[in-house]
From Swiss-Prot:
Descriptive protein name: Argininosuccinate lyase
Enzyme class of the recorded protein, top EC level: lyase
Family: Belongs to the lyase 1 family. Argininosuccinate lyase subfamily.
Entry EC number(s): 4.3.2.1
Catalytic activity: 2-(N(omega)-L-arginino)succinate = fumarate + L-arginine
Source lineage: Bacteria, Pseudomonadati, Thermodesulfobacteriota, Desulfobulbia, Desulfobulbales
Subcellular location: Cytoplasm
This protein's encoding gene: argH
Length: 464
């Protein structure tokens, strides 16, 4: 280690310079550089407040604002050099400010610590990302309503335990995903409300003795208010964990959709045709059309879940207040945001180019005793207790399996061997169309209910 005295902005207490290996290991500028515009905006608001409170002069404020603007312009132009020796985005910008305007620049950090400064930058960045995620979720929801409108009235099998269960409208299935992503949207907005409190002015962890005005800075930066406890503010990363939890849920929903698209596109199902532009081929098998984009979306769920686990594990044992461990919060969040944003965008695009094979979907409802529940409901309407009706239909299904036929293939006489209350009107309820149209309960797959739900969804996404 060199004997040279530290030249860091915080280096007054140190007699030796930081080792190069330590500098490389501890730097964060390689990734927190994306926060630069928030750091500059926060510094401008902070400087303005310091001037208003008489802590710096109007002339110094003017120099600081001009210096920060010139730094931002250089960053935007790609000519600003970020250096690992200055560790992070804050120190790079502050050092550049001091280099450009001299003593006035060294007055900017009064009543501020990097602890509350990074929390400010991070929250402002996440706030913007929440707004962007809402736009992407709206786009995904819009895609589901467009597909739903296109195939309104078409029927496919619904599944439980990956076995054919009951017939449903394709639109009903698409609206199920619409509901998932609307909940995701609500969660993001709810998360945004909680993170929209300014931490600036809490300083390192105990507040400051200087006569600052936290509310002025919060208002200038668009925050709803200020945080209430300086120790909690310095220690807090709930907002990062909460948002990443929301992102994990979004990617989970995307993964479930992707899994269905992969399955439905197989030769065994043939329910959907994913556009060639969202598939790839094989390097050895000429016939292959692989649903790689859907598979990648499904696969990326692992890295988003990993980001959440990383954050939770990093925070679980930290005493109050700030610890350097918290520097490790940003990369997982950045990666989760980037991954989910890209996945949402390409999912909406892929859905817009996907086609359902409606004939094949309808054909799949003709086997697997998919209207067995309808027969049980029919018996209930004939005053047969449901458990008895369930047993009767189960016996009929077993007989059909032995005979190698489906329920609609039985004659009325054969039906009546299982229950004498069965009449000729039974065959109307054993069709997929009859089954779907009977599901008129709120939230059900009946055409009337689905049309109502689709119209409401279209209104919510701005189509109708």
């Amino acid at each position: 280690m060199t004997e040279q005295k530290s030249k860091k902005l915080w280096g007054g207490r140190f007699s030796e310079a930081m080792a190069a290996s330590v500098e490389k290991f501890s730097e964060s500028i390689s990734y927190d550089v994306r926060l630069y515009k928030y750091d500059i905006a926060g510094s401008k608001a902070h400087a303005t407040m310091l001037s208003s409170q008489g802590i710096i002069s109007p002339e110094e404020l003017e120099q600081i604002i001009a210096g920060l603007s010139s730094i931002e312009a250089d960053i935007e132009a790609g000519v600003f050099e970020f250096k690992t020796e200055y560790e992070d985005v804050h120190m790079n910008i502050e050092q550049a400010l001091v280099d450009r305007i001299g003593a006035a620049g060294s007055r900017l950090h009064a009543a501020r610590s990097r602890n509350d400064q990074i929390a400010l930058d991070f929250k402002m960045y996440l706030r913007d990302q929440c707004d962007h995620l809402v736009e992407l979720l709206d786009g995904a929801c819009r895609a589901f309503t467009v597909v739903g409108r296109k195939y309104l009235g078409d029927i496919m099998p619904g599944y439980t335990h990956t076995q054919r269960a009951q017939p449903v409208l394709i639109t009903h299935h698409m609206l199920a995903y619409y509901e998932m992503f609307r909940r995701d949207r609500d969660r993001i907005l709810d998360c945004r409300k909680r993170l929209n409190l300014s931490p600036l002015g809490c300083a390192a962890m105990a507040g400051t003795g200087l006569p600052i005005n936290r509310e002025q800075v919060a208002k200038a930066l668009g925050f709803a208010g200020v945080t209430a406890n300086s120790m909690d503010t310095s220690a807090d990363r709930d907002y990062a964990i909460e948002l990443t939890s929301c992102l994990t849920m979004i990617q989970l929903h995307l993964s479930r959709l992707a899994e269905e698209l992969v399955t439905w596109s197989t030769s065994e199902y043939k329910f959907v045709d994913i556009s060639d532009s969202f598939c790839t081929g094989s390097s050895i098998m000429p016939q292959k059309k692989n649903p790689d984009i859907a598979e990648l979306i499904r696969g990326k769920s692992g890295r988003v879940v990993g980001s959440l686990i990383s954050l939770i594990t990093m925070m679980k044992g930290l005493p109050l207040t700030y610890n350097r461990d918290q520097q490790e919060d940003k990369e997982p969040v950045f990666d989760a945001i980037d991954t989910v944003s890209a996945s949402l965008s390409i999912t909406a695009e892929m859905m817009a180019h996907m086609k359902f094979n409606t004939a094949r979907c309808a054909e799949a409802t003709e086997t697997g005793f998919i209207t067995a529940t309808d027969l049980a409901d029919y018996l209930v309407m004939k005053d047969v207790p449901f458990r008895q009706a369930h047993h009767i239909v189960g016996s009929a299904v077993a007989a059909c399996i032995a005979k190698g036929c489906e329920l609609p293939d039985l004659t009325l006489t054969e039906m009546q061997e299982f229950s004498p209350v069965i009449e000729s009107d039974v065959f109307a309820v054993l069709t997929a169309e009859g089954s779907v149209n009977s599901r008129v309960s709120t939230g059900g797959t009946g055409l009337v209910r689905v049309t109502e739900a689709l119209t409401l969804a279209e209104k919510c996404v701005g189509i109708a």
